[in-house]
Structures are given as structure tokens and as C-alpha cells.
Amino acid sequence: MANKKVRVAIIGVGNCASSLVQGVQFYKNAKNDDVIPGIMHPKLGDYHIKDIEFTLGIDVNVTKVGKDLSEAIFAEPNNTYKFSDVPNLNVPVVRGMTHDGLGKYLGEIITKAPGSTANIAQLLKDTHTDVVVNFLPVGSEMATKWYVEQIIEAGCAFVNGIPVFIASSEYWGKRFADAGLPILGDDIKSQVGATIVHRVLTSLFVDRGVKIDRTYQLNFGGNTDFLNMLERERLESKKISKTNAVTSMIPYEIDPNNVHVGPSDHVPWLTDRKWCYIRMEGTTFGNVPLNLELKLEVWDSPNSAGVIIDAVRCAKIALDRELAGPILGPSSYFFKTPPKQFKDEVAHQKVEDFISGKSDE
């Protein structure tokens, strides 16, 4: 019989981790049939939000390592919205592996904790972790792949919240399939964030017969994610992920010079808020121009946590069903760069079919 808890470890105890941990506490008494702001599924399959238990935090920052997870999520430089107190969880934050996890700008504000890297694979086994969530900084290619090896060795499911291509990689997808383990990813698509809004508008233009000529999506915010992305060398996979998430909705070729999607700047006073500007220029009936402009303001990390809170439960369902490799439906709805792209309404139905057991994809 499956364990009726979802035991979750977190790599990278930053703002996204903070919102997720707060959210589990905040929504623990949510009723299954309520319409609840910020929640798609109070109960997802057999698992209510209160069934999510945290087992381990992994970080390198001296302000977090050695603390309880409930304390570390509020340590500097975290600066997201605090919407819930969190009691002591008796969940340690241990010293992780750095590799390329700290870039130029993060390295200026983060002091690495002393000591050696913890035995991550053994800790995941010892804590009976089911699912590991990756919240490392953008550009952490080597670090992510190092952690993936530990996760496979420990026998855990993997939810990849960042734009390092693991679930969408044929090599890594096969590694998880061969190990008999599920993976969801890559690069979390927030509840109502820049990517899904841009995708839906793109689909609307296409479905209504408006040819898309040019578009941009500019994003800026005040958290460490945007600070890190000032280092343009770390942005390649992020730009690919965000751009393809939009252009995959266009069934015809569009000049790459006419599409610009990506992070733009770091504005410290925005803290964990993100502001997004989207412009779309199209041609409609009679070759008449049609232009659209939109501004979106969100708190970045709660916006992602509302999706991750479902993704970890889908990963546990996949474990329960002994599914292996990339899980296509949840990956396509919850992430920017899944192994296979679907229109969002199709992906949404695939998630519901997966949850209900009508489909194992």
C-alpha cells in the first residue's frame, strides 16, 4: 500500500521554497470542495495539501545551513511575501554542493557555509524522501546534474523547477526510465505568470486568424533570481525555455529577430515582485494591423508555489503507480519546457486525466 504522505526534499532554500513551505502550512485545513484563492486542487488524487511533509532542505548559504527549514525560509537574502507563520518542522537544512550554483552576482551577497558537502543520496534514503524539488539558481547546469545523480541513487522522484533540461532531455529521461523513477519538468510555469499569459494570448491570435508578426516579453524584479540573471552567460537555457514556450504555440515560422522573450533587469525595491510587459503586433482582416500591450504584476514565488504544490503530488502519484521516466501530462501543464508541448487547455485535461487515473501520461 502506498504511503499516504508526500515526503519532499528541497534543493535551494530560496524564495520559491519559502512560498511552498508557507503554503503547505497556510492551506493545511482547506476543504476539498472549496474554491480557494491560489489553489487548483486542495486534494489531488489521494493527497491533500496537508499530506505534504518536508524531509530535508539543501543549500550552501551560511544564513541557512544548520537551521531548521522553518527558520531558513525567512533568512536573508529571501525577500518574498510572508503570508503564514511556520512552526518548527524538525527538518534540517544541510550543506549542499556548489559547483556552478553561485554565479558572479550571487557570489557577492552569499557566503558559503563552512564544511564539506553532506552525503545527499544517503540523507534522501534515511529521510524516506519521495520527491525532490530543484530550486537552484538559473544557470546551475553542473550542480543540477550532480544532484540528479544523487536523486537517482536514492530512488526518488524528481520535480525540476529550473531551466536546466533534464525531463526534456532524451538522455536524462532514459536514465530515470531505466531507474524506474518518474520525473516532471523542466522550468516551472507559474499559475498566472508571464509565460502562460503570453502563451494563451498567442494561441488566441492564432485561433482567431490573426498573424503574429512581432512580439516581446520583458520581465524585471527585485529577487535574487533577477540579480543572478544579470549575468547574461547564465541565461542561455532560460531564454530558450521562455522563448520556446511561446513560439511552440505558433504553427508557422516567425523570424527569430521578431521575438524577444527574457529577463531584462534587477530592480531591488521590487523585492520578490515581478513586473512583466508583453507586446504583440499582428496582421488581421484586410491586412490591417492589430497591436496588444499588457502589464502583469505578480509576487513571483507564491505564483510558482501554486503550481509546484500540485507537481509534487503528481510526482508521488507517479511513484505510487510505478511509472518511470518523464510524466507528459503534468510536465506539459506545469512546466515551460516539457518533453512534449501541448496547448494549455489540452495539457490541463491531460493533468485531470492523470489525476483521475484515466491516463498514466
What feature does the model see in each segment?
Residues M1-Y147, L235-I240, C276:
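N-terminal glycine-/serine-/threonine-rich beta1-alpha1-beta2 phosphate-ribose binding loop
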Residues I11, K50-E53, K64, A72-N78, ...:
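Active-site-lining helix/loop region of Rossmann-like oxidoreductase modules
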Residues N303-E361:
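NAD(P)-dependent Rossmann-like dehydrogenase/reductase catalytic/cofactor-binding core
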